[in-house]
Amino acid sequence: MNKLFGFFAMGVLMLTSCSEAQQSAEQPWIVDRFDDIKVIRYEVPGFENLTLEEKELIYYLSEAAKCGRDIMFDQNFKYNLAIRRTLETIYTQSEVKTGDEFAAFEKYLKKVWFANGIHHHYSNDKFTPEFSEAWFREQLAKYINDENRQIENDLLCKILFDKELYASRLNQKQGVDVIVESAGNYYEGVNQAEVEAFYQAMIDADANNPEPISYGLNSKLVKDENGKIYEQVWKIGGMYTEALEKIVYWLEKAATVANPTQKEVIEALIKYYKSGDLKDFDNYNVLWVKDTASNVDFVNGFIEDYGDPLGRKASWESVVNFRDVEACKRTEIMAANAQWFEDNAPINPAYRKKEVKGVSAKVITVAMLAGDCYPATAIGINLPNADWIRKEHGSKSVTIDNITYAYDKAAQGNGFAEEFILREEDRERAKNYGKLGDDLHTDLHECLGHGSGQLAPGTKGNELRTYSSTLEEARADLFALYYLGDEKLVEIGLIPTLDVAWSQYSDYIMNGYMTQLSRIELGKDVEESHMRNRKLIAEWCYEKGKAENVIELVKKDGKTYIVVNDFVKLRKLFGELLCEVQRIKSEGDYEACKALVEGYAVKINPELHKEVIERNAALNIEPYGGFVNPEYELVTDAEGKVVDVKLTYPANYVEQHLYYAKEYSFLPSIN
C-alpha cells in the first residue's frame, strides 16, 4: 500500500532545470508510442562510479528480478501466460507483418506486455481487440498446432472477444462480490464472504499477537472439489516454484559479492522463498529495514496488495537500485526532523507516534525494474508495509530520481501547461519550482507520510477492507501537501520559498479534479486507488472551501480551468482532511471511510470528463508511461574472472519483451 505513482506521464511535470549528474544522450527519450501509452528509456547515471563488487551485485540482483516476470502475468489473470505465449508465437512466426489487422494485433500485444496481461494496468478493464476474430482464427490455424498450443482456440477467442467475460481484473464497485467479479488470479472457487471468513478466523486466533503476520500475503486461496478452502503458497516446492528457484539461484550469487550485512538480508529472503513462512518474511523485513548503510539496495518479493480487491494478496515485484549521494541530502534533512513533523501533525495527539523510530529516507537511482514495477513503475516507495514492523523498527523510503528525470525529459514541450493552466503566474511557478515540488512531495509522502501516525488500541489495521489502499494513499498525500506549505521547510533549507508549495498545490488540485480524468474511458468510474485518492482530496477541498472561493472552476473560451485562489486556506483544508483520514485509519472506521471514498472519489462529471479527454487528445499526449530496462553484461578476463560490468541502453520495446519471453519465462502456461 506504500507506493507512490506520480502523474508525470500526463505531462504535468513542467520544463525544469536538470541535475548535472543526468546527462542527456542523443537517443530519443520516448522509444515507442501506442494506444494510451508512451514507452520511455531511463538512464543509470553513476553506475560507472560504483565498485566492481557493487556492479556485480547489481548484475545478479537484476537477473533475479527478470526471472520473476511470469509471476506477475499469472497473478493478474489465470490465462495471461497462455494468451501471451500464443500471441508471441503468432507475432514471431508471421511471414507478413503488414496491413491493418496485423497492426491492430501488434498494438494489442504491446498493450498485453505493458499491462502484464489482458487487462489495463490502471483502469483494470479488459482490452478490446481492434483486429477481427475471423482474422485471428486464421492466424491460429496457420501458426498454432498441437505442439505449441497453450490454450484451446475457442476458449482463447471467447476470452479475447467476449466483452463481458473476465471484464475487469479488479472490480471494487459498491454492492458487488469483489472476489467473484474480479478476474485476478488470487482466488479460485471462493466468494467474498468465504474469503473474509477464512482470514478473519486466522486473525481472531492470533488476536493477542503484537507481531501478527500478513495473513494470506503470499498465497492463492482456492476451494477443492470437496468444498475445502485452502492456500496454495507461493514458495519453492509450491506454486510458482519454477520461477522462484531461478530467482533464488541468482540471489545466492548476489550473496557472494554482498557486504556482510546485506548478505544476511539476502540469505533471510532466500530462507523465506524456500519456506513460504510469513514469519520468515517478517524476519527478512526487519533485517532489510535496518540496513541503511549499503549503497546498493533492492526489493524482491510479494510486496504490494493493490491488485487484490480485499487488499490481502501481494503482487510480485523487484526494484534494484543504488544511492544518489548528492540528492540524498534533502531526504537526510527530512529524516533528521521526523519527530518534529510527527509532533506537529494536525491530527488527534492520541494518534501521533510518541517516538518516531528508524526513519530512513534516500533518493535512489534505479538499475532494474521487474514484475509489478515494470514497465510502469512508481516514483517513490515506502516499505515494509506491516504496521508493527514500522512502529518497532521503522521503514525505508525512497524517491526514484532517474525515473522522474526520464518522465521530465519525455514530457518537455508537449503543450500541456498552455492548455490546462489558466494563469500565467501558475505556469511560471510550475516552470521554476515544479520539479522541486514534485520531488519534495514524493519525499514527504514516502519518508514521513506513510510512516506517520499510529493505530488506536484494538484496531488491527484490516478494518477498511476494499477502501484501505485509497485511504492510505490519501493520508500520505495529505501529510506531504500540508507540510509542503509549512515555513519549517524554508527554515531547514528544503525550499527557498513557499512558491514551491503553491506550485504543487495548483498542480495537485488540477490533476485530482480534472486532468487525470483523461486516463479513464468515458462513462467509467474511477477505480484505481491512487486516482481515487487524488480525486477525493481535490473534490473534498473544493466543496469545503467553496463558500470562501478557495478553489474556483473558471470557464474561458468554452474551456474549463480550475484555479487555487487562496493557498493558505487550502493548506488548512488539507490539515482538516488529514485529521479525519488519520482518525478513520486509527479507529478502523469502515463506514466513515466508505462514505468519504464513495462520496468524493468514484463518480465523474460526464461533461467535464468528455472535455478533458478531447483537450488531452488534441495534444497527442499519452496519459500513461512506462519504461524499457537497461541491460548488464559481465566482462571477464582470460581466466573467466569478472573484471567489469557493461551497461547498455536498449531502445526497442518489442525486442526487449521478446527477449524476456525467450530467456526469462519459466512458469507453466496455466498455474
Protein language model regions, located:
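Catalytic Zn2+-binding segment of zinc metalloproteases
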Residues: 447-459, 483, 487
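C-terminal motif of bacterial Sec signal peptides marking the signal peptidase cleavage site
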Residues: 15-17
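Contiguous, non-catalytic segments that form substrate-binding/exosite surfaces or channel walls
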Residues: 110, 114-223, 229-427, 434
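Extended, compositionally biased alpha-helical segments that mediate assembly or anchoring
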Residues: 570-671
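An active-site-proximal "capping" alpha-helix that borders the catalytic cofactor pocket
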Residues: 51, 259, 469-486
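N-terminal-proximal low-complexity accessory segments that begin disordered
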Residues: 24-86
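Post-HEXXH active-site segment of zinc metalloproteases
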Residues: 453-474
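Long, well-structured alpha-helical subdomains associated
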Residues: 43, 481-584
